[in-house]
Amino acid sequence: MAWPCISRLCCLARRWNQLDRSDVAVPLTLHGYSDPGSEESGADCSVSRGNPSVAGARESSRAVPLTQYQRDFGVRTARAGSRDAAQERPSGPGGRRGQSSAPPTRTVYVLPVGDADAAVVATTSYRQEFQAWTGVKPSRSTKARTARVVTTHSSGWDPSPGASFQVPEVRKFTPNPSAIFQTSAPQTLNV
């Protein structure tokens, strides 16, 4: 008989290569590195650094899949490590690039309500494949049992324990299977 899979690590290792970006809860970011998906030749990189509008057009034309975090909370982030996205930001009033200082717009994502197909699309594969373990025993009660305290005197707290110390009396009863002999003999009635 095989041991049960306790930690589910074997399941994670088996499906690790099947993960897509929506299964990662927190968007992963690489600071200071170029995007691995946008590997270009050295000449193109120098042109894109010099002219941010051309690189921005290339970036916006490519479809970027949203992560589960972005789907749930509507967060739109710039690509990790792209220097062009940082250069395209407006630099405020009187900026060096002469761009207009428009206030940044905030987008709010509203979760779909009532559509069953949209709810299935919004969940990840692990949420769809979840099954509760069967055959698990319920845990024992953690309720503490009441302890009985035997006191030897009724005065309560005594500041001098040596003077009033009494050894608790220990009574041992021998087991007696017959209940008849445990009581005194009945007295005869005088009529």
From Swiss-Prot:
Example of a GO biological process term: negative regulation of microtubule depolymerization
Residue segments, region Disordered: 31-106
Keywords: Calmodulin-binding, Cytoplasm, Cytoskeleton, Golgi apparatus, Lipoprotein, Palmitate, Phosphoprotein
Lipid sites, type S-palmitoyl cysteine: C5, C10, C11
InterPro entries: MAP6
A GO term, aspect molecular function: calmodulin binding
Segments of this protein annotated with the region Mn 1: 123-136
Disulfide pairings: none
Tissue spec: Expressed in brain. Found in neurons in primary cultures, but absent in glial cells.
UniProt key word Lipoprotein: yes
Phosphoserine carried by residues: S38, S41, S160
Mod. after translation: Palmitoylated. Palmitoylation enhances association with microtubules.
First-listed, main subcellular location of the protein, grouped into a coarse class: Golgi
Subcellular localization: Golgi apparatus; Cytoplasm, Cytoskeleton
One Gene Ontology cellular component annotation held by this UniProt entry: Golgi-associated vesicle
Ranges for region Mn 2: 158-170
Similarity comment text for this entry: Belongs to the STOP family.
Cited PANTHER family: MAP6 DOMAIN-CONTAINING PROTEIN 1, STOP PROTEIN
Described purpose of this protein according to its UniProt entry: May have microtubule-stabilizing activity.
Entry protein name: MAP6 domain-containing protein 1
Organism encoding this protein: Mus musculus
Lineage of source species: Eukaryota, Metazoa, Chordata, Craniata, Vertebrata
